[in-house]
A protein has these predicted regions:
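Short, surface-exposed beta-strand-loop junctions and turns on beta-sheet-rich folds
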Residues: 8-9, 17-20, 72-73, 105-106, ...
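Hydrophobic residues embedded in beta-strands of well-ordered beta-sheets
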Residues: 10, 97, 127-130
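Conserved small/polar residues in nucleotide/adenosyl-binding loops
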Residues: 163-169
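Beta-strand-rich N-terminal accessory domains
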Residues: 1-33, 37, 41, 49-64, ...
Length: 169
C-alpha cells in the first residue's frame, strides 16, 4: 500500500516461510500520524536526502541558503521536503504505481524547476522496485531516496536485531 502523501510505502505484504502474508514495513495506522510524527516512515525524500551542512551550498558560484530544520542544518529537503508533499498519481495498476511532483524554481530554497516521477513496481519474484526519474531546467542539486524501515519478521513488536543477512564478501 502506497499513499500519495509523501509517496510513502505504508505497508508491504510478503509471504513468510509458511506462505502467510505479513506486513514487513514499519509505519502508522493513521494518515494524521504521518503528518504529526517526524520519523519519515516509508517516505520519498527530496529534494535532497541527507543533511546539508548549515543549510548552505554553492553551485556555479552562487551560494544558496536553505531553511534549517535540524539543529542548524537542512535535513531531507527541509520542512517543504518531498515527504510533506501530495504527489499526483500518473499511472496505476495491480503491480505498478507512478507518482509525479513538480516543484518550481526557488521551492524550499533550491534552484531550478524540478519534475520528479517515481515508479513503484511489484515484481513476479516478490520484490519492490522503486525507480526515480527527474528533469530540471537549470543546474541544481537533487538526491532522492526512500525512507522505509523493514522488519523482516512481520511482527512489529519483535526485535529485528535478532536477524542477520548474509552478503557476498
Amino acid at each position: 500500500c502506497i499513499t500519495n502523501y509523501g509517496g510513502r510505502v505504508v505497508s508491504l505484504m510478503v509471504p513468510d516461510k509458511n506462505g502467510e502474508l505479513r506486513d514487513v514495513v514499519l509505519g502508522h495506522d493513521l494518515i494524521a500520524d504521518y503528518r504529526n510524527i517526524d520519523n519519515n516512515f516509508g517516505a520519498l525524500i527530496g529534494r535532497y536526502g541527507n543533511r546539508i551542512d548549515k543549510g548552505k551550498f554553492t553551485l556555479d558560484g552562487v551560494e544558496y541558503d536553505l531553511p534549517k530544520n535540524n539543529f542548524g542544518h537542512c535535513l531531507h529537503g527541509g520542512e517543504k521536503g518531498f515527504h510533506h508533499s501530495v504527489w499526483d498519481m500518473v499511472q496505476i495498476s495491480d503491480t505498478l504505481l507512478t507518482l509525479r511532483l513538480n516543484t518550481p524554481d526557488g521551492y524550499a530554497g533550491f534552484p531550478g524547476n524540478v519534475d520528479v516521477q517515481v515508479t513503484y513496481t511489484l515484481t513476479s519474484d516478490n520484490a519492490l522496485r522503486i525507480a526515480y526519474r527527474a528533469t530540471t531546467d537549470k543546474p541544481t542539486i537533487l538526491n532522492l531516496t526512500n525512507h522505509s524501515y523493514f522488519n523482516l519478521s512481520g511482527n512489529p513488536s519483535q526485535d529485528c536485531l535478532l536477524y542477520t543477512s548474509p552478503s557476498p564478501r
